Amino acid sequence: MIGGLTPLITFNGELGMRALLLAAGIGSRLRPLTNTTPKCLVPVHGRPLLDYWLDLVFEGGIERVLVNTHWLAPQVYDHVAKCRWAERIDLVHEETLLGTGGTVLANRPWFTNQRFLLAHADNLTDFDVAGFIRAHEGRPKGHAITMLGFRTDDPGSCGILELDQRNTVLAFHEKVPDPPGNLANGAVYIFEPEVMDVMASFGRPFVDLSTEVIPKFLGRILCFETSGYHRDIGTKESLQKAHSEFKQGSRGTLI
């Protein structure tokens, strides 16, 4: 049992990296669409965002996925139960949103004290998951996090990164008026177990990743820049752009 609920499918002993797909967002800026549709099930070219993610991570080498839910959770449960990856997915419901770090801590046993991938399932992306994992395995000594970076057309709305010559993240500027560049945090990470220890050190259930955890690891984060497509589907405008920019293929390719 995880988080007070029995998962859809229980862990059956696979070896390999696990992933947490954060899918509990309400999507208030996408209303009225999200009044009746969970944000993670908002469609692009007829496919829910969550389906793109599940194909992406499983085809990229992830062995098992945990999906958290909150708003309109029964729809997410029903959708996952019918998908082709159902036997490798666990679901956990949050009556009260815990924040990214809080969700990790609430389900800490599920990660089996191993490194894991974390992503926000309300983004649309087609990055190289296998390459991302390989980059983490070859990260500089002492680094505990690998972060996906992408080039944004709207730097003021993103967390902008400053890197050194090794692609180590030295500074992180969250939605500032005059950002120093356009390389943005893609909100996809691989964490070593020690990152969970830092989350736990706050001593409370709600922990924010961007403002509380990431700053503690500056100088120990490798940036993996994707050349593929990546967009936060947080507004009606961004959803419209995704429909015009992203062409559905096996997972999707940038036109």
Each PLM stretch: what is its role?
Residues 115-117, 124, 130-139, 153-155, ...:
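Catalytic-core segments of class I nucleotidyltransferases/pyrophosphorylases
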Residues 162-168:
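Short acidic-glycine loop/turn motifs at beta-strand connectors
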Residues 2-21, 29, 43-120, 124, ...:
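Conserved N-terminal catalytic core of the sugar/cofactor nucleotidyltransferase
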Residues 140-150:
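A short, conserved acidic/glycine-rich loop-to-beta-strand motif
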Residues 36-39:
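Short alpha-helical oligomerization interface
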Residues 43, 149, 162, 190-192:
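Short, well-ordered beta-strand micro-motif
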Residues 41, 91, 145, 221-223, ...:
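Conserved beta-strand scaffold positions in the cores of enzyme catalytic domains, especially
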